Amino acid sequence: MHVEITPADLIVYADENLISQVVINLLKNAIQAIGNQPDGKIELKASCNDMEEIWIEIKNNGPEIPSEIAEHIFIPFFTTKEGGSGIGLNISRQIMRLSGGSLTLLREKETTFILKFN
């Protein structure tokens, strides 16, 4: 796992326990996505843009999420995992909204979840 925080003194004004729950959920999903891939990688990057918005990106190089699944992943109880509850991403998105931020999925070569704090 690769972690990059720029600048090193980023401060997010939000409930630490709730945001930790979101990050842990996304990291667990990333670990499951890469499975036993020998070249599997997870990256966590935190940064601040020119508008002073803080972005936390959690990226993995597991299998691509198909469009028909991606459009449903934030819906409560939607899951493709055996034994999964389908509430993790929905709760994570609700936590981010209550914290004045957002949680989005970016699908390119790798799967990236972006937490944005305004």
Regions found by a protein language model. Give the residues of each.
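A residue-level detector for a conserved hydrophobic packing site
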Residues: 19-20
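Acidic ATP/Mg2+-coordinating residue in the GHKL
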Residues: 60
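Short alpha-helical Gxxx[C/S/T] motif in the catalytic ATP-binding
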Residues: 88, 92
